Amino acid sequence: MDKTLQTYDWKKYELLKDDYIEISGVKLYRIRALVDFNDVKKSDLGGYVQGEENLSHEGNAWIYGNAKVYGGAKVQDNGLVLDNAEVYNNALI
């Protein structure tokens, strides 16, 4: 069964406002999956984003581990950011 998210009227993750780090004065929030998709299970913790504009709710895009996406960067479609990677400065994955 294909576990790619196809319905876009709901969110696949939430920002954990009480679980954050700061980089150069910018808060990055840990993400938590709200649904199962691809190899991500509901309640799995992901990496860090500055806001929802950094990670699409569509497709299988995900940020794993302690990876960070911020500063106008975006992960979309089936893009993955792993381990301790940092994506920023309007990069598109």
Where on the chain are the PLM-derived regions?
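Terminal amphipathic alpha-helical/low-complexity segments used for targeting or macromolecular assembly
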Residues: 1-58
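A detector of tandem-repeat and repeat-rich interaction/domain scaffolds
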Residues: 56-93
